[in-house]
Amino acid sequence: MLVNNGGGLPQGDTDNPELIAQPRGGTPSVIDTQKELEAAARALSAGSSPIALDVERAQGFRYGSDPYLVQIRREDAGTFLIDTHALPDLSVLQPGVEDVWLLHDCLQDLPNLRQVGLRPSALFDTEIAARLIGLERFGLAAVAEQVLGLGLVKDHQASDWSVRPLPKEWLRYAAL
């Protein structure tokens, strides 16, 4: 089934999904200084679209589930990859992320986002939505394929995100 995704996304085909292997606009640099974080806060505050967030951890490599990278995407502001090892307090971003948050499996990421000082005012969980509409597979890649007709490269989700510097291929994955 052909899907017109709009918003600059390629047209998808749920029978033959298009593989998305590179982020639109390239891979952004990692934000690891307070000055860069404040610039991201200004950019996010200037936006008005919903905000997609994700967190990368080092589960299976480190004890606990601390966040090591927070990804934020706002269509009209850009993509931000934030090193929470270098910047453990992201509360300066809160005024710029007061719109609807888009998360997948929010129960995994909300505790980490709270840990770095971010709290949603409203959220939409794509995993819960997938379950509610009766999809049989509800992982992020499966939902993107079934609903948007787009395939996601999910090759580094189980990596040790505590490693520094983060490899370029991991950053590409994180920016998708």
Q: Residue spans of the language-model regions?
A:
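Active-site-proximal helix-loop-helix substrate-binding element of RNase H-like nuclease domains
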Residues: I20-V30, Q71-L176
